[in-house]
Amino acid sequence: MADEGDVLTDLDMDPAAGGNGADNRPTAGFITQYIKDMSVENPNAPGVYQWQEQPQIDLQFNIGANAVNEEVTEVELKINVEAKTDQGALYIIELVYAGLVGIRNLGDDQAHMFVYAEAPRILFPFARRVIADATRDLGFQPLMLDPIDFNGLYMQRLQQKAAEEAQGEGGETPAGDA
């Protein structure tokens, strides 16, 4: 312990108190983001530019995650868009927009939620811009995808999974003679 007149102070460097210099705080964040795969098709050009019918937009998305190592996970936001009319497809865009996420000292539940809810929420505006630019570059109006509530979808999926597990455990009676 330092005296009052001493310049040195007690920095509480006791390793048992966690002051060992190790980074043991919970952390999650992006390392980088990138287009992993992209396909853009305009299969009926140039005739498509003469069509008058409003296209139907079919949008599908999926979230994937791959562990790169113990602390890094690649999160993939997969978006497929097809604009079509009775005459055929105007355009087809398939995009896999990914990000490397660093996660350290988080519980499994928190890490899972970050990977499948928060990371896609952060990636989506960038993927949305890529889709808008691609449709514009195809010669059409930019397609501005509506925001997606990834946190709400994540919570809904957890509730659905819990209900399925509860139904599977006690809801069925065994077959056979009684």
UniProtKB/Swiss-Prot annotation:
One of the proteins required for the normal export of preproteins out of the cell cytoplasm. It is a molecular chaperone that binds to a subset of precursor proteins, maintaining them in a translocation-competent state. It also specifically binds to its receptor SecA. One of its GO terms (molecular function) is unfolded protein binding. NCBIfam families: PRK05751.1-3, secB. Belongs to the SecB family. Its main location: cytoplasm. One of its GO terms (cellular component) is cytoplasm. Keywords: Chaperone, Cytoplasm, Protein transport, Translocation, Transport. It is found in: Cytoplasm. The keyword Membrane does not apply. This is Protein-export protein SecB. Pfam families: SecB (PF02556). One of its GO terms (biological process) is protein transport. Homotetramer, a dimer of dimers. One homotetramer interacts with 1 SecA dimer. Coiled coil: none annotated. Residues 1-25 are annotated as: Disordered. Transmembrane segments: none annotated. It comes from the Bacteria. Residues 1-13 have a biased composition (Acidic residues).
